[in-house]
Curated annotation (Swiss-Prot):
Organism: Carapichea ipecacuanha
Record's protein name: Cephaeline 6'-O-methyltransferase CiOMT
SUPFAM superfamilies: S-adenosyl-L-methionine-dependent methyltransferases, Winged helix' DNA-binding domain
Gene Ontology MF term list: O-methyltransferase activity; protein dimerization activity
GO BP annotation list: isoquinoline alkaloid biosynthetic process; methylation
Enzyme class: transferase
Binding site for S-adenosyl-L-methionine: G193, D216, D236, M237, K250
GO cellular component: cytosol
Length: 350
């Protein structure tokens, strides 16, 4: 085994550089959060063309005495790829376009959610959690589960729902264009855990003869209004799931333990017709092997798996792990349809 003393100077320098890059990467995200709070992406968009530093600082809600520091913030954000700089003017990059508040497809709320103190504190408590009997690092940090915390903090719940909605906009665009066949022939669909209905609205619009129902906890759907072939129903998926030709679970199961996933899936199975009559469950989730074979820069499931541990003590799953859940829940047939990088559409039939 090599030691520091036996390593070459070049190796040590590379190691230190790698370590520094990883360690200080948080500063990029903290700076991005600052940019969102100040409204920098939207200020550039509203300007209609690249902005010079003077124009930008004048458009931001900052103290005049702090204006000289904006160029240092922008320098970091340009290096991180969120903005572009040319001839002393700043513009949005394709990544930056995803940060616009009023664009339906955006990750602004997701960024703010991931950098919210409520989600950062459990990571700080991770080592403490390994040495205690708490169910999750989130409980160690806050004294209550993630879902209890969310139900008691309306502002945090709103941010969480907005983050999930932004994610659903992109997924829905792909689903109703490239994977329409998944929904063809269905007369009714229940989106379990569908939040404010972003995904279900897109499906309902694309399939006007398909009756779509969003089923979620009362606090998630209390302020939502149905329209045409879309309605909202309050309830708990651990108690029951409304009957339909198909049940949709978009990135729901990775929030839960194997035992709870089986409970959810069994309730879904009870609510759909038999296979010969077209009953099925449609799952959108990550599959670990697919990420390993993706061959791109998507850094996802290892990081997301750790987040599932920290927040819920749940996990991302392999095909083998998914198959066991399906079997335990009484499903005899399933197929994996690769969709977005490591994300899969999984069709289950009884």
């Amino acid at each position: 085994m090599e030691t520091v003393q036996s390593s070459s100077s070049a190796e040590l320098l590379r190691a230190q550089t790698h370590f520094s890059t990883q360690l200080f990467s948080f500063q990029n995200y903290a700076s991005l959060k600052c940019a969102l709070h100040l409204g920098i992406p939207d200020a550039i968009k509203q300007h209609g063309k690249p902005m010079n530093l003077s124009e930008l600082t004048s458009a931001l809600p900052i103290k005049p005495s702090k204006a000289p520091y904006i160029h240092r913030l922008m320098r970091m954000l340009v290096k991180a790829g969120y903005f572009a700089q040319e001839n002393e003017c700043f513009d949005l990059t394709p990544i930056g376009l995803l940060l616009l508040k009023d664009d339906p497809i955006n990750i602004r709320a997701l960024v703010l959610l991931e950098l919210h103190p409520a989600l950062l504190l459990p990571w700080i408590a991770l080592s403490e959690w390994f040495q205690n009997d708490d169910a999750t690092p989130f409980v160690t940090a806050h004294g209550k589960s993630f879902w209890d915390y969310t139900s008691r903090d309306p502002e945090f719940r709103k941010l969480f729902d907005e983050a999930m909605a932004g994610d659903s906009e992109l997924i829905s665009k792909v689903l109703v264009t490239e994977f329409k066949y998944v929904f063809e022939g269905l007369k009714s669909l229940v989106d379990v855990g569908g939040g404010n209905g972003t995904l279900a609205r897109s499906i309902a619009k694309a399939f006007p003869n398909l009756k779509c129902t969003v089923f979620d906890l009362p606090e998630a759907v209390a302020n939502e209004q149905g329209d045409g072939n879309l309605d909202f129903v309050a309830g708990d998926m651990f108690d029951r799931v409304p009957s339909a030709d198909a049940i949709l679970l978009k990135i729901v199961l990775h929030d839960w333990s194997d035992e709870n996933c089986v409970k959810i899936l069994k309730n879904c199975r009870k609510s759909i017709p038999v296979k010969d009559k077209g009953g099925k469950v449609i799952i959108i989730e990550g599959v670990v092997e697919l990420e390993k074979n993706a061959g791109n820069e998507y850094a996802g499931l290892e990081n997301l798996d750790m987040e599932m541990l920290v927040l819920y003590n749940s996990k991302e799953r392999t095909k083998k792990e998914w198959a066991k859940l399906f079997s335990d829940a009484g499903f005899s047939d399933y197929k994996f349809i690769p969709a977005l990088d490591s994300w899969c559409i999984i069709e289950l039939t009884p």
